């Protein structure tokens, strides 16, 4: 199983090198870096669905990335440009969707789909494929993280009293 979808320009090969990459949802940047030469520049954005599930969108093989961890990104905002993952591949965008709250890069091919999602088949991500489902505020992701930490602190304090 390929863990994502690869998007190429109309002309193929490197015709899309440097083309803009836009965020597909309102999101929070949770990772920016180069996990390995094969991935190249990578961004991971977290988004809370209308049903409350956190999904991650991984944009890889970028030539440039313009978003920093902790930054709030709006749908349609330019976050990078299409690249070649350090000349390892012809230029293209590798886009992965994950049903996960932890930042894990992993491999580009796996034996089971696991937490990787197919947006065309998974209505949990885009109910009825409505564009409105892409708009919940990314701040809800950080709010959930803060609430979880607060609950953990309360539990720790209650267990030691």
Predicted regions and their residues:
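Serine endopeptidase catalytic core focused on the charge-relay Asp
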Residues: 1-5, 37
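Bulky hydrophobic/aromatic "packing anchor" residues in well-ordered structure
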Residues: 6-7, 136
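Zn2+-dependent peptidoglycan hydrolase active-site motif and core
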Residues: 16-18, 22-66, 91-96
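Short hydrophobic beta/alpha edge segments that flank linear recognition/processing sites
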Residues: 42-45, 74-88
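Acidic, glycine-rich catalytic/binding loops that coordinate metals and/or anionic ligands
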Residues: 65-77, 96-161
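Active-site/pore-lining binding-face segments in mid-to-C-terminal subdomains
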Residues: 82-102
């Amino acid at each position: 199983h390929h863990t994502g979808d690869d998007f190429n320009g109309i002309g193929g090969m490197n015709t899309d090198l440097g083309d803009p990459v836009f965020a597909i949802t309102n999101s929070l940047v949770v990772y920016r870096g180069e996990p390995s030469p094969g991935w190249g520049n990578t961004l991971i954005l977290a988004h809370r669905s209308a049903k409350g599930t956190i999904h991650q969108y991984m944009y890889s093989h970028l030539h440039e990335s313009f978003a920093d961890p902790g930054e709030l990104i709006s749908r349609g905002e330019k976050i990078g440009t299409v690249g070649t993952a350090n000349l390892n591949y012809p230029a293209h965008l590798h886009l992965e969707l994950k049903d996960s709250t932890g930042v894990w890069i992993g491999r580009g091919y796996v034996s089971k789909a696991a937490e990787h999602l197919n947006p065309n088949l998974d209505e949990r991500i885009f109910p009825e494929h409505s564009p409105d489902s892409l708009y919940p505020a990314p701040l809800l992701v950080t709010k959930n993280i803060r609430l979880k930490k607060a609950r953990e602190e309360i539990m720790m304090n209650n267990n030691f009293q």
